A protein has these predicted regions:
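Structural beta-alpha unit
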Residues: 1-2, 30, 76-111, 148-151
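Small/aliphatic-rich secondary-structure junction motif
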Residues: 2-54, 149
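Phosphate- and divalent-cation-binding pockets in alpha/beta enzyme and binding domains
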Residues: 19, 98, 120
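Hydrophobic alpha-helical membrane-association signature
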Residues: 20, 68-71, 129
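General small-molecule cofactor/ligand-binding pocket signal
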Residues: 38, 87-91, 142
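A short acidic, glycine-rich active-site loop
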Residues: 55-70
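Short beta->alpha linker loops
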Residues: 67, 90-94, 116
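Gly/Ser-rich helix-loop-strand patches that form or flank binding pockets
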Residues: 101-151
Length: 151
């Protein structure tokens, strides 16, 4: 049986992330895991059609990361206060790429993440972070769409 000593819960701070917390906490408790909660703050380098002077970009990115940390701390305090959270972290970058990188750097054993279940044009326009993580991660990824419940 695989051991999941470190579980990563990447969040986008939406209600979708909050909805899957029972799955995340159940897995963390079942395997007595250290839970890493990660928010990736999308930065300007990924908006290549907008021109903003470099100094403004650095200031903006610092504010985005600081604001993300504040919101993530609130999210954890509200939703995960009774669980085994060991790391709460905000990093700048592209969410899909940074989640996969975090898995490798931190030695994560399992990723548990939400999926919005977008289809068609929405998926083409917005992409799928979950799909990228599932197809490129070196560890198992459990995806949960909280809006698709068993009947």
């Amino acid at each position: 049986m695989p051991e999941f000593k470190k579980i990563l819960f990447p969040v986008d701070l939406s209600e979708v992330s909050a909805e899957i917390i029972p799955y995340v906490t159940n897995m963390a408790r079942t395997f007595q895991s250290d839970l890493h909660v990660l928010f990736v703050a999308r930065i300007f380098k990924y908006y290549d059609t907008i021109y903003v002077p470099p100094v403004s970009i650095v200031e903006f990115e610092e504010k985005v990361v600081a604001g993300g940390q504040r919101r993530l701390d609130e999210f954890v305090a509200e939703h995960l206060k009774d669980c085994c959270v060991s790391v709460v972290k905000v990093i700048p970058g592209d969410p899909a790429e940074e989640i996969v990188r975090y898995v490798d750097v931190e030695g994560i054993d399992l990723v548990v993440m939400s999926t919005h279940g977008r289809k068609g044009l929405d998926r083409v326009l917005f992409g799928s972070v979950a799909n990228h993580v599932v197809t490129t991660s070196s560890v198992p990824v459990m995806t949960v769409n909280p809006y698709r419940k068993k009947k």
